[in-house]
Structure formats: structure tokens, C-alpha cells
Amino acid sequence: MSDLKMQRSGGEPLDTIKAYIALTKPRVIELLLVATIPTMLQAERGENNIVLILLTVFGGWMGAAAANTFNMVADSDIDQRMGRTRARPLVRHTVSNRDASIFAWVLTVASFLWLWLLCDSMLAGIFVLITIFFYIFVYTKWLKRRTHMNIVWGGAAGCMPVLVGWAVIVDQFEPGVPQQWWQAIVLFMVIFFWTPPHTWALAMKYREDYKAAGVPMLPVVRTPVQVTAQIVWYSVATVLTTFLLIPATGWIYAAIAVISGVTFLFMAIKLHLGIKNGGKVKPLKLFILSNNYLAVLFVALSVDAVLGLETIGEMLGWTTTFF
């Protein structure tokens, strides 16, 4: 009746609850909030259906929590070999793999039904199912352990909240109202291009962890100069993509997109030049900045949409339904 048995049983009820919460990776789910709410506000620009937004966020949260839990089950073998993941519930046996899998399946079904029945959008529910399938089978089980481009293509799963949010809003539109899916695609691509520099900056700090676990992240298989060069290129792509949305937004988003974008690029280039010139650099600074950059950008989009400001496209006389 050792401590190990108590550990495997999950200990006190509060500890078990904390373990299940940890399975969902709450910090990762922050991206869901950052992406979904501004996207929905932009889609309905000026309407601000708060109840529908909150319902969608909760439904999306269940889907993201399911994906993250499945991910922990699939990665439990390598998590025990990485210093920063050894305290995860499945490694410490506070939750069994079987119970975690059941938890993930319940969340998956609940998320789909929630979005379909309560948010009146089967399309949003289907997007969540696609996200979970892609994240587990394409990224976790296939790409992650086989290619240094894992996060580039696998990161597409993290972009899906914008499509979920947009789908819920446009499914409420009357027939004939332009759905303007191009805006959702732009926001999808912003997160798609943002994910690699964000992740690689963190992976540079934990390079030895990934190496020990046999995960071929770019910093493991390429030199720091090569890694930071890729970070710069993807940062450029991110910033340029944010500009594509300017015609459909007001001056607040436009100004923040330019100012924050220049700052993000400056820090990415500074990191690259610092390493290239043999200086002492801290990649984690770029990781933190990238988080703040995306948050500020989407907050600006939210404020712009809530205020219902005249769009740049309207200011320029572009009166087509495209904008």
C-alpha cells in the first residue's frame, strides 16, 4: 500500500480534478480564446451576440480540451523523457491512460453536439472533429516524430478556432447575406504563419529536451543560424498576412497591425543577427513577445469590430460586398 498506489489512484479528489484540468493544457487553450472571440466579433461586426459567443467558446474549449487530452495519451512515452513534461498527470500516473482516453472521447462528443445543437452550427461541430482528428493522427502520431516540419503543417490544427467561430456566425445569416469567408481564411493563415516562429523560439530553449525525446524539432536538426533565419521568414509572412485584413477593418486594427508587426519583425531579426554574430541571445524573449503580439493584434480586431468603425475599404470607396 505504498505511495505509488496512492499516486496511481489519484490521491485526494481535488488532486484528481487538478490532474484532469492539466490534461486539457489550459495555457494552450488560451489561443482558443484569443482567436475565437475576435473572429466572431469581426464576422458579425457591430452585432455583438455575447451569449452566442460564450456558447461557442465553451463548445470550442471542450473540443480543444479533447484534442489536448488525446495528445497527452499519445505522447505519454516521450513526456517522461522531457524535463518540462515529467510532471504531467499520465507520467505521474495520477490519471490512467484509459481514463484519460474516456475523458477525451466524452469531450469530443459533447463538443460536437454542443456546437451543433446549442450554437446551431453543424459545420462548426464538423470543424472541431476535423481539428481533433488532424491534431492526433496527422500531427501527434505522424508528423511530430518524423519531420522537422512537424509544427509547420501540424500547426494548422491550432488555426481551426477561427473557422469554428466564423462558421457559427455565418450560419445565423439570412440567405443571400455575404459570408465573406476570405476574412476567416486570412485569420487562419495569420495563426498558421505565426505558429512556427512562436514554437521554434521555445524549442531553442528546450532543444536538449526534444533531442532526448527523439522529437526532430527544427532546433534539434538545424543550426541556430538556420533556425532563426526560418523564424524571420515566417515572421515576415505573418505580418504581411495581417495586412490583408486591413480593408475589412477600421483604423484601430490597421494601426496596431503595423506597429505590432514592425516590433515583432524587429525582434525576430534581432535574434537572428545576434546568433549570426555570435552574441548571447535569449530566444525565450521572442517566444513571450510572439504571445503578446498575437494577443494585441486580436484584441485590436475585437475593439475595432465592437465599435463598428468605418472600414478602410469603405473609406477608400470600395463599396462591394467583398469588404
UniProtKB/Swiss-Prot annotation:
This is Protoheme IX farnesyltransferase. Signal peptide: none annotated. Its EC number is 2.5.1.141. One of its GO terms (cellular component) is plasma membrane. Pfam families: UbiA (PF01040). The chain crosses the membrane at residues 50-70, 97-117, 118-138, 150-170, 184-204, 231-248, 252-274, 293-313. The gene is ctaB. PANTHER family: 4-HYDROXYBENZOATE SOLANESYLTRANSFERASE (PTHR43448:SF7), PROTOHEME IX FARNESYLTRANSFERASE, MITOCHONDRIAL (PTHR43448). It catalyses: heme b + (2E,6E)-farnesyl diphosphate + H2O = Fe(II)-heme o + diphosphate. It comes from the Bacteria. It is found in: Cell membrane. Converts heme B (protoheme IX) to heme O by substitution of the vinyl group on carbon 2 of heme B porphyrin ring with a hydroxyethyl farnesyl side group. Pathway: Porphyrin-containing compound metabolism; heme O biosynthesis; heme O from protoheme: step 1/1. It is a multi-pass membrane protein. The keyword Isomerase does not apply. Carbon 2 of the heme B porphyrin ring is defined according to the Fischer nomenclature. One of its GO terms (biological process) is heme O biosynthetic process. The keyword Membrane applies. GO terms for molecular function: protoheme IX farnesyltransferase activity. Keywords: Cell membrane, Heme biosynthesis, Membrane, Transferase, Transmembrane, Transmembrane helix.
